[in-house]
A protein has these predicted regions:
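Conserved small/polar residues in nucleotide/adenosyl-binding loops
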Residues: 207-209
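Thiamine diphosphate
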Residues: 1-171
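Short, acidic Gly/Pro/Ser/Thr-rich loop/turn segments
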Residues: 122-123, 176-178
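Glycine-/acidic-rich phosphate or pyrophosphate-binding loops and their flanking alpha/beta elements
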Residues: 9-13, 156-167, 178-205
Length: 209
């Protein structure tokens, strides 16, 4: 199997979605001309144009709200935070709107939106850019949260997240963007909500974060 970087796996999944589904578009801070805080969207603006790769103001509340509206109207937005730390600014939109619309409408309105968010510390960006709120968000009914740990999982999970008809948060550990791993050329997805059993046995370790 070819070996690729974590960021390249994400980029492949995003590019596939943009190429194959005209309803998919992206928006976030510096994802266009700058190519994203971690270079995941580098080259996308030139390839797909400003109608589908939208640089936004520094207002997570505004562009998450815009993403929810676009998703409810039938599009499939992919919203990018520079850091999951800034999800706090958009908690009202995420928790009270994105997570609830399907239930409040009796299933008449879906919110097929992906929120991508670098998470964690270790990249010298200071305390305000180094939080890990994925466990908070995972407690919200109506929100799915995935956190890939290698390029194989990153590609399989981003593919499934984009196809899901409900909001999915992809928490991407910032320390892993430069990590390499084996990823097959053949198409695959990783089912959301299904545990990955890496090794079977009789002993269980419980790790609390």
């Amino acid at each position: 199997m070819p070996e690729i970087l974590f960021r390249e796996a994400l980029k492949r999944g995003l590019q596939e979605a943009l190429e194959n589904d005209p309803r998919v578009f992206m928006m976030g801070e510096d994802i266009g001309e700058y190519g994203g805080a971690y270079a995941v969207t580098d080259g996308f603006l030139e390839k797909f144009g400003p109608e589908r790769i939208k640089d936004t103001p520094i207002s997570e509340q505004a562009f998450v709200g815009a993403g929810i509206g676009a998703a409810a109207a039938g599009l499939r937005p992919i919203v990018e935070f520079m850091s999951i730390s800034f999800s706090l600014v958009a908690f009202d939109q995420i928790v009270n709107m994105a997570a609830n619309l399907r239930y409040m409408s009796g299933g008449q309105i879906n919110v097929p939106m992906v929120i991508r968010a670098p998470t964690g510390a270790g990249v010298q960006l200071g305390a305000t850019h180094s939080q890990s709120f994925e466990t908070w968000l995972a407690e919200v009914p109506g929100i799915k949260v995935v956190c890939p740990s290698n390029p194989y999982d990153a590609l399989g999970l981003i593919r499934s997240a984009i196809k899901d008809d409900n909001p999915v948060i992809v928490a991407e550990p910032a320390l892993l963007y430069g990590d390499k791993g084996n990823v097959p050329d053949e198409y695959y997805e990783i089912e959301l909500g299904k545990a990955d059993v890496s090794r079977s046995g009789t002993d269980l370790s419980l790790i609390h974060i």
